[in-house]
């Protein structure tokens, strides 16, 4: 597609240009909001605490909130409650018959499910905000602890999360790219310069050897190249169309291919898995020594870098890869039905149910490779990060999110440019047709 798309046409594509400016405007609003603090926070104590937690769980949480958690901004919870609510609603949609029926009702059913997701977001954000407010008080990071602080903190953080959810939905509908993914993407990219400065300052002070610095740089470059290769990898399923007759016209049969990505779920499984595993860490981060025996035990076994954490990370990535693919991004039954309606078929496979079973079999095998790729990209740098204490922004999850979102956004821009070029060609052909008719009418009659 890139070869057929002229980037010079960007200036003429008014709708695309407006979408890009709209997206940039909303993302700027998001970044400004990360610097607005929650009322009642002791800024000096918070900065001192976050300096000690920057390379640990604090750095991980800051990655998903664009640094807002480290500054205790109004967007400190980030978009994670919305993602968690989406996971729960999608799981329930597959298990509850009423929700499954809503899913099949088209646009109206989708709106109803989105409404349930918003209710779930408010509920989860309220729980997390209250837990975070209590943890801040326990960690002596509040100037005036008490009921008023907890209430104001909960209202502020829940309002910030709902505003981010609205920003993401508006970006998806009226801008470019997936709004939720772009919010996480911008948060990661905005914090990378500070992480790099911290990383190289550790090298200058001798805390990290030059060999480790070179190794991390090489690892990041190799990871980026590997992610780009795997995200562009496709399995093409051959589709045949028979010869058919409509009235007096005979249409010749043809063939095409159905492209299936090696990683159809994209970056969603990594985001889902990370958001769920970080729920207990969000509460325990600011609690100091008052964590409690239960939470201390959980963090001892399920903290980042621990064997059980890594094991559950892999299991969740594999699970969400299959779950998201077959429930959202690629539904074999719907694809088989569409092929049947278009008189298309897979050679050697009967249309309908047999085609759906074949597609499910093929995609399941592809997903085995795709989920293994996701787990490797997210897991191996995580192990190295735990051993070498490098900033989390150089980890596999952050690299995967940045590369995947960049590629998806560029692809959407190219699609809009290509559509604009086709619209221009159609308008030119229509104008040429009208001018020829006018010339024919004005031609003088022969005597």
Show which residues each predicted segment covers.
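N-terminal cationic and glycine-rich segments that engage phosphates or anionic surfaces
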Residues: 1-103, 107-447
């Amino acid at each position: 597609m890139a070869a057929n798309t002229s980037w010079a046409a960007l200036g003429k594509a008014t709708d695309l240009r407006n979408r890009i400016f709209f997206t940039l405007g909303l993302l700027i609003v998001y970044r400004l909001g990360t610097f607005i603090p929650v009322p009642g926070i002791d800024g000096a104590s918070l900065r001192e605490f976050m300096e000690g937690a920057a390379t640990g769980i604090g750095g991980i949480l800051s990655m998903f909130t664009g640094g807002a958690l480290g500054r205790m901004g109004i967007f400190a919870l980030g978009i994670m409650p919305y993602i968690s609510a989406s996971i729960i609603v999608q799981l329930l949609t597959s298990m509850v018959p009423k929700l499954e029926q809503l899913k099949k009702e088209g646009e109206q059913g989708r709106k109803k499910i989105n409404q349930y997701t918003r209710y779930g977001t408010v509920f989860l954000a309220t729980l997390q905000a209250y837990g975070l407010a209590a943890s801040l008080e326990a960690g002596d990071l509040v100037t005036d602890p008490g009921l008023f602080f907890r209430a104001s903190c909960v209202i502020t953080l829940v309002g910030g999360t709902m505003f981010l959810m609205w920003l993401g939905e508006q970006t998806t509908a009226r801008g470019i790219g997936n709004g939720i993914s772009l919010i996480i993407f911008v948060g990661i990219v905005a914090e990378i310069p500070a992480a790099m400065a911290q990383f190289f300052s550790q090298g200058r002070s001798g805390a990290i050897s030059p060999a480790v610095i070179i190794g991390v740089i090489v690892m990041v470059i190799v990871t980026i190249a590997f992610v780009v290769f795997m995200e562009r990898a496709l399995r093409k399923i051959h589709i045949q169309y028979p010869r058919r007759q409509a009235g007096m016209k005979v249409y010749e049969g043809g063939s095409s291919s159905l492209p299936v990505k090696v990683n159809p779920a994209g970056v969603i499984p990594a985001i889902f898995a990370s958001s769920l595993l970080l729920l207990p860490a969000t509460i325990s981060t600011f609690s100091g020594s008052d964590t409690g025996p239960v939470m201390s035990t959980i963090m001892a076994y399920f903290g980042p870098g621990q064997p059980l954490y890594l094991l559950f990370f892999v299991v969740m990535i594999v699970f969400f890869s299959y779950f998201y693919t077959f429930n959202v991004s690629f539904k074999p039954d719907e694809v088989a039905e569409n092929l049947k309606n278009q008189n298309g078929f897979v050679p050697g496979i009967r249309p309908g149910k047999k085609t759906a079973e074949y597609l499910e079999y093929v995609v399941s095998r592809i997903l085995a490779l795709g989920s293994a790729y996701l787990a490797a990209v997210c897991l191996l740098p995580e192990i190295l990060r735990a051993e070498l204490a490098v900033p989390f922004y150089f980890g596999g999850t952050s690299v995967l999110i940045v590369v995947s979102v960049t590629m998806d956004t560029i692809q959407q821009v190219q699609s809009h440019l290509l559509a604009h070029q086709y619209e221009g060609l159609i308008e030119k052909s229509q104008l040429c047709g009208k001018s020829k008719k006018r010339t024919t009418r004005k031609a003088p009659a022969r005597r």
